Amino acid sequence: MEKSWFNKTSQEVEQELKTDCQNGLSSNQVQENMKKYGLNELQEKKKDSLLKKFLEQFKDFSIIVLIIAAIVSGVVGVAQGEGFTDTIIILIVVILNAVIGVAQESKAEKSLEALKKLSSHASKVIRNGKEQVIPARELVPGDLVIIETGDYIAADLRIIEAVNLKSQEASLTGESVPVEKITEKIDGNEIGIGDRKNMLFSSSLITYGRGKAIVVNTGMNTEVGKIAGMLDNAEKQETPLQQKLNDLGKTLGIACLAICAVIFVIGLLQGKEIIDMFMTAVSLAVAVIPEGLVAVSTIVLAIGVQKMVKKHAIVKKLPAVETLGSSTVICSDKTGTLTQNKMTVEKVFCDDELQDVKKVNTTEDFKKLVYNCMLCNDSRLLEDGQLAGDPTETALVDMAFKLDYEQSIYRENPRVEEVPFDSERKLMTTVNKKNGKYIVYTKGGVDELLKCCNSFLYKGEVRTSINNYAKWIRENNEKMAKDALRVLAFAYKELDHMPSKAEMKTIESDLTFIGMVGMIDPPRIEAKKAVEKCKKAGIKTVMITGDHKVTAVAIAKKLGILKDESEALTGTELEKMTDEELTKNVRKYSVYARVSPEHKVRIVKAWQENGEVVAMTGDGVNDSPALKTADIGCAMGKVGTEVAKEAADVILTDDNFATIVSAVEEGRRIYDNILKVIQFLLSCNVGEVIVLLLATLFAPQIGQWFGISDITMIQVLLPIHILWINLVTDTFPALALAFDPANKDIMDRKPVKRNEGIFTKGRTFRIIYQGLMIGLLTLSAYLIGLGTTHTAIDGLTLEQTKIEVGQTMAFIVLAFSELIHVFNIRDNKNSIFKTGILGNGVLILAILASALLMVVILFIPQLRTIFSIPILPSDNIIETIVLVLSPIVIVEIMKLFKVNTTRDE
């Protein structure tokens, strides 16, 4: 069972770890403990090799189908003496897809490495009775550590000496305010990390004071280490797009086998040769499977990734882009994600009224308050203009600077004496000299300070009998506390002489109360708009934080995340719920406060059990397991811990919650465009299948109508024609669809459900009827070619000439009608005359490039030979143009009568 150190006295810890609270460990003890516990390091998960990453790309069912098609094509090619041309083309596509996937993962890893800090931390310890500085990785349990302001804590420590010690633990607990530390033991066993005030934890920062502590846990045994261990056990689900494309691949694979089997049997019944029917079946297989779909989908995602970089998001894995677009719930950490992670003064009580700091009246009383904020303060201004020190104190100085108070105030009012803050008095006092006078400035908790005051400032006057006025002060204190503001009170008195040491002992008496300030880690300005945008888009925002409930609720109300406090739940309340109860009730809650890393994972899983696609944002170590469990984890790049970045799928380089919403919008655009690609490629492929099916089924009749005695010659398209169209002619326009801009209403519609497949009622209807349209147009071209050819070409019989002219017309009409058809795909509702054809310049270039490649094949003799294409007779050109332009006319008529879409679209 794991040891608890917070409920032991300093002496018990000292005895159990065999250390010395004065002299620390001996050299021999250090060596023994190093052997026993190892280095103070987190175990890094071994990164996959390039080969493993490459092989991972071949798991998709659609890729497996393509590989099988390549093998079959190779076998048939050898049997027919045509070589491996088809096989090589298919394998190039498969390998290209894998290379793109690996390249993106490697690129994201490099970007992540660039974000990592290169600094290595050191710790000051006492060993053998002497102080020494050692690398933090060499700390062992039992080490006696000296702690000072600004120190980074590199192991879990039990405090044995503390002088005004405060620690910033936001990255671990989510609490935005530094925690005051104590040395006394804490009774109880079930004490949350945030309430173990006699402990210091790895990854936290000392913001104030000094002390000594004993190392109790290192490496993977620290609280941070336990979280890192949870990451290895976190399950990662397939993204919605991966699931849908895999389902699509299986559907196409089954359809391919079924169609091939039917055609093979029909052909044999018609008396055709087995090898001929095998070739026809291969042609059908090639026609059914959209060879370019996987590569195009990958490239569409890669293009989306590049756009995301410009929007301050680094995507580690390609499918993550689309998952963002499918998100239905965003679970967000509060501190540093929804808030600025910077304490800021919001309210001021001065001149007898509670005022917004931005609208405060700059009276003489307020001036005294600001001087107190600046001078009774231990924060310091760095050379780069940044403030360093306790966040509460830096907030006070920041307020003064924003109100144009100058640094010269420090020079004109030098500090000559002080009484430091301590947790018992909850007060801090300085004595500052100005123009021969001595002014005592005191700040602290409201109740503690009022005990030291016998008068108060009231609109420029000093008034006595503070007791009645104290009620009004406390009422305003409560108002600020209800808004989750941290309140500090300020008082002063003037002396005509430098106080003696004896006088300093009672200096905090007979003070004049000036006023109070209320501060909070405020919401990001852009976060409220982002939350509103999420609501419009049908996405629920959930706040999950380690901070106190009152603070979380106040921030959530300001952001519009919750309306009523009943929507908030604490970690203690959550602990009492079973997983089943949480799954059943998870929709009731919008805010979770004082939760642990384990709780965050449970919340994410509960939403997933309800069929939601969950995005999780955060920056702390405490967010990491949930980041990995979520469908999409988004870590903050600037202040995010390395553990969080490793666990995430996306890293937001500007630490901005609004960026996640922009990323969702980009994800939706990409998903829409992938659906356009699928509809385009499948409708084209269905057209090819219909042509081959009809030609095979009605081969005897076609032979009879057009005087072709050998019906085995009747083949509308050769395998090389289909491959060329699928891999070259169609691929460029399909790729260009990736650049289609988002629809204006893209963030005004509900997210796509996780279980909604690609083949919705409307999309299935469009794929079938548009495929039928392309198939019949292509077959018509073939039949026209057969029927209008009356003269044999040199070296060919008339029958052979008819077949080649028919195939040429079919090839041209199929290729060019599909290029025209891509304009229909861009918008299923609105007419092309409304949307225009120039909205996507890349698409225009892609169509021109594909058309140019077709022209090259048609007019270069060597290529015509490879593709078995004769020169097209001039008297067939008019019919060809009419057939090529027909898809636009047909689909426009369907749109006009509103039958291109279903009611639910």
What are these regions (language model features)?
Residues 755-772, 800-809:
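Membrane-water interface at loop-to-transmembrane-helix junctions
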Residues 729, 807-822:
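Generic alpha-helical transmembrane segments
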Residues 697-717, 784-806:
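Helix-coil boundary and interhelical linker segments in multi-pass alpha-helical membrane proteins
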